[in-house]
Amino acid sequence: MYIKNVHLINFRNYDDMYLELSPNTNIFVGNNAQGKTNILESIYYSSIGKSHRTNKDKDLIKWDKNNTYLRTYVSRERLDKTIDINIFKNGKKAITVNKIKIKKISELMGNLNVVMFSPEDLRIIKDSPGNRRKFLDIELCKINNVYYHDLVQYNKILSERNTALKNWNNKINDIIDIYDEQLSKYGAFIIKERNKYLDKLNIIGKNIHKKITNDLEDINFRYLTNIKDFDNTEKELLIVLKKNRKKDLERNSTSIGPHRDDFEVSINNIDTRIFGSQGQQRTAVLTLKFASLEIIKNIIGEYPVLLLDDVLSELDSNRQKFVLNSIDKIQTIITCTGIEEIDKYLDKKQSQLYLVNNGKIKRV
């Protein structure tokens, strides 16, 4: 899988930009705030229907325009895909794939698979459990439409349950019983799929991490949940929800479920979030991203597109070398402010360089 070309109109700081891409390595070089990340953002949006930088679609529209247009042409082994997206300031958007209208975001996912690595991804390791849940949810939604559906349903019912808790009376108690059954059904599936994904990360990620660290470190991922019996997840989740209802009523929120879960990343049996060095935390994220590439490849039969947003400068020479030696079969799109540090690791025959300046791109 690779992107042949991208066409952007009124997207961020681009007026009308058409770009042909190499199926191998593409490097966009320029100073900060020139539009490098905007290119990656448009590709990411074409993949999952949302930005990695903002929750407001109107932020993507050039400040003095009423709409933006994105077209991404994707070469696939079986059938090429043309993804067209129109986003309007009034909040509406229209998406087609090969001229067929997309009614749900789940229908968009899977046409263009990407894995993005940006400096903000360090939050996966360093920050709150919400960042780790978000990572799992995004990766699973890319490859599992049922997961996407059940996650949407779970969040909808969770919101309704929390509203009911705030307006509790004896009649509402019966309604909460119904919510608990629905949450248990969808929540059990989410918990099981997250746990299975981490099992895959353990199998694939351990080898990747050993390569990066020259066999000096062993990495492990472990799902953290109140559910102990994964063979009876739905039943156990229902029991725990009922058990915690009094506490939930006092707090006006649901205290148990996959929306509260987490996963632990340990290196040599030490919690990386608390005790890991910054270098170890970066390596752990690198492992997560490259393991995700392999998981997608194993499921769909071809590698996704890799987006590296100004991260190579954050890595030491050993990690830079690992990244650039691992992308020969993967279309990779890199942004950076200069290539001096990574130039010696680049395969010049497989690399295409672009200069970015104030929303203008020049192929070198």
From Swiss-Prot:
It is found in: Cytoplasm. One of its GO terms (biological process) is DNA synthesis involved in DNA repair. Gene3D superfamilies: P-loop containing nucleotide triphosphate hydrolases, RecF/RecN/SMC, N-terminal domain. It comes from the Bacteria. Keywords: ATP-binding, Cytoplasm, DNA damage, DNA repair, DNA replication, DNA-binding, Nucleotide-binding, SOS response. Transmembrane segments: none annotated. One of its GO terms (molecular function) is single-stranded DNA binding. NCBIfam families: recf. HAMAP family: RecF. Belongs to the RecF family. The RecF protein is involved in DNA metabolism; it is required for DNA replication and normal SOS inducibility. RecF binds preferentially to single-stranded, linear DNA. It also seems to bind ATP. This is DNA replication and repair protein RecF. It comes from Clostridium botulinum (strain Okra / Type B1). The lineage of its organism: Bacteria, Bacillati, Bacillota, Clostridia, Eubacteriales. The gene is recF.
